[in-house]
Amino acid sequence: MKNFVSILSIFIIVSCSSGKTPVEEGLESQILHWGNGSEPQGIDPHIVTGVPEHHILIGVCEGLTITDPKGGRENLPGVAESWTLKEDQKTYVFNFNPNARWSNGDRVTPEDFVWSWQRALTPTLGSQYSEMLFYVKNAKKFYDGEINDFSEVGVKAISDYELEVELENQTPFFVGLLAHYSTWPVHKETVLKFGEMDDRSMKWTRPGNHVCNGPMKLKSWELNKKIVVEKNEFYWDADRVKLNEIHYYPIQNESTEDRMFRAGALHVTNVVPQEKCPVYLENKNPSLRIDPYMGTYYYRVNTTLPHLSDSRVRKALAMGINRKLIVEKVSKCGQKTAYSFTPPGTSEYYPDTVVEFNPEKAKELLTEAGYPDGDGFPTIEILFNTQEGHRKIAEAIQQMWKVNLGINVEIYNTDWKVYLSRQDNLDYQISRAGWIGDYQDPNTFLEIMRPGRGNNQTGWVNYEYERLVAEANKTSDQEERYKKLMEAERILIDEMPLIPIYTYVKQFQIHPDVKGWDANILDHHHPKFVYLERD
C-alpha cells in the first residue's frame, strides 16, 4: 500500500507545482498515462506471459501482423506489408516492408525472424508460449530434441525481403496468432551482447540496452513506480504515431487507481473497483467503459496433489460454487457465468458443457471420493495475485466451500511475479487464473490444456483430449474441427483440472481526451492508433 500512496503523492506534487494535472499536461504534450495493474514480469517477448507485459510489448515491439484495432477478424500488416498462401494451403510467404527498422536504425530482416523463432523454440530458454510456433513444420520436433538442425524447421528467409513459413497442416488461424508477442522478433546482436540465446536474465531489455521494432521505444523503468516509453523515430509507420510517450503505472490497488483517475492522474485505468461498478452504472458515469472481452476467469487445480488428483473432488469443488451469486453480488460489472473454458461465441463456437451449482451432488461426489461431508479433507489454499477483486471472489468461494461442502479453505495473496512463479512450479493447491484469447479462435483456449504445454500449469494429462485437439487442428473443415474441439471441451469440463467461474468483460475508466481506443474482444490497443485530443 505504501507504494501506491507514494505514486499518488508524486502526482499531487506534480499537479501542485505546475497547476495542471498529468492528464491536462498529457493532452498538451501527447503523453498517455495508463494504469497497468501489476509490475511487469519483464518485456522479453519470448519469456513473459501476462497482460501487463502485453500492454507494454504492443508498444515497443511488432510482429509480422497486428490485430485490427476495431475488432475485425482479419489482421493488418506489421513488419510484413503483405502475405500470400500457396496452393498447398499450408505455406505462407511474407513480404517485408523495406522500411521496417529496429529502434537503433537497423533494418528488420527475414533472418531476424528465423533466429528469433529458433530462440523461442530453444527448450533451455523455457518459453511457456513455445507451442504457438508448433504449427510450423518440424518446430515441435526441434523443441523436443528429435532434430537438432534448425534449418529443417519450416521457416526460411528466401530473399532479403521474403520469409517463407511452411506449416504442419492447414491452420486457418495462423496469421491471427502472429500478432501475439511470443512470435515477435528480438534483435539478435542486442540479445547476444548481454547473454546467450537462452539467457533468461533479460538484461538486454533494460533501459539503455533495449532494442526492438515497435512504434515506441523504452525510455525508463522505475521498479514498482513507472515505465516510460517514447516515440520510436525509426518505426516504419512513424508518421501515423501521434503519442510522444506512454507512462505505465503498476497499480494493484483498485481503489487507489480509481482515486488517481478521478484526480486527473490517469487517462486509462486497468479495472474498476468492484464496489464502484454498480454505482457508476447507476449514475451513468461517462468515463465507465464495459467492453466485450474474450476471456475466462477460472481457478486452476493442482491435480498432482493426492487430495486433488480425483476428478470427483474437482467436480465437487466446481459444483459447490454459485456462479450466479458471484457475478451478481461480488463482481457486479456485467460478467457472465461460465460453464465452459472457451467463452461461448468465440468465432461462432458455442460449447454445450454445463457446470451446475448443486451442493447435494457435490457432497455425493465427495463421499464417493472418501470425504463424507468434507470429513478428512485437508485444508486447501486458494492462491491469487494481489488485487481487491480477486480477494473478494476468493472469500466468497471460501465461504461457499465451507457451507456447501464442509471444506476448510485458506486464502493467500502474493505479488504478480511470485504468483506466476508458484504456478509455474506447481507450488499451489487452487490458484486464481484468467485466460484471455491470443487470437480469435477456440483453439487459443483449448490448446493450453494439452499435455506439456507451458500454460497448462495444473499437472493434468489426458491423451484423448490431446488427440482430439491435435486432430481438430489438422482439418480446415470448420464444422468437423469444431466438433472435435467440442468433444475435447467436454472431457476438460468432466475432468475439471480447471474450474470456470465467469466470462470476462473489460471494465475500465477512460478519459474523453483519449481517441482511437476502440472496443475489441482481444483488448489490443496499438499505440499508433491512439492519441489525445479534446472535443
Model-found features: residue ranges?
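Gly/Pro-rich hinge or "lid" segments in bacterial periplasmic/extracellular proteins
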Residues: P69-K70, L167-V241, E245, N253-S255, ...
